[in-house]
Amino acid sequence: MKITSANDRKTKQASSNWFTGTVWQDSIIEAPDPARVRALRVSFEPGARTAWHTHPLGQTLYIVHGTGLICVRNNKPQLMRMGDTIWIPPLEEHWHGATTTNSMTHIAIQEAQNGQVAEWLEQVTDEDYSY
């Protein structure tokens, strides 16, 4: 068993390769092999969002603060609110983030396949982000 203190977790700013705007990440679960589960607390400032991406085994989001958006390729963004849980099936192209006027924090839970939890695609355009 391993207990990780909250004081030992490092908050880091998310990479601009995969995010637009200011996004902060805290690793919650980085279970060693053979376990596959990974979880992050991700905080998006207003207007911030992920790039388009997929997850090999799907992803669950749980909204812990604020109001956000989630969008599946070729669809309009949908609102996510505090307390909502969203399941994204394996390999579904999507993005998620805050609205233009509200911050949003979610817990992102996904499993790794061959060490990979996501495949990152292109950045989300302002047109795709409009709701």
Regions found by a protein language model. Give the residues of each.
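Glycine- and acidic-residue-biased ligand/ion/polar-headgroup-sensing regions
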Residues: 57-69, 73-74
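A short, N-terminal "cap"/entry segment at the start of jelly-roll beta-barrel domains
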Residues: 1-36, 117-131
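A short hydrophobic beta-strand segment most commonly corresponding to one strand
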Residues: 60, 87, 101-121
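Short acidic-glycine-tyrosine-enriched beta hairpin
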Residues: 74-91
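Conserved short histidine dyad/triad with adjacent acidic residue
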Residues: 24-27, 38-55
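Short beta-strand His + acidic residue motifs that chelate non-heme Fe in jelly-roll/DSBH
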Residues: 50-52, 70-71, 88, 93-100
